[in-house]
Amino acid sequence: MDRGQSLIIPPLFDGTNYAYWKVRMRAFLQSLDEKVWQAIEIGWTKPKEVLADWGEAKIKAVNFNSRALNALFSVVTNEEFKKISSTTTAKEAWTILQTTYKGTKAVKDSKF
């Protein structure tokens, strides 16, 4: 990032107005790097081999996951953090928030 360039941080998510927060958060994550967003959309799986054997591509992938997970942890209230604090992947944290506040397809279908 260029020195002096400001970064717009998404609003703190407190469990309300999820649809608005989700759009802002996605744009924020993509502004960090498209691969940060991909860590949420596609997910990341920890390789079976030891860290020393991961190679550059796997190290980059874990770093994108870590950046995404850190971003999510940083923009939620303590109450929301409790819901996602035990996750190790950004996709898992995002899915928990999405299921909690948007619902699953089955939940949506049951509302009709």
List the predicted regions and their residue ranges:
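N-terminal Lys/Arg-enriched interaction segments
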Residues: M1-F112
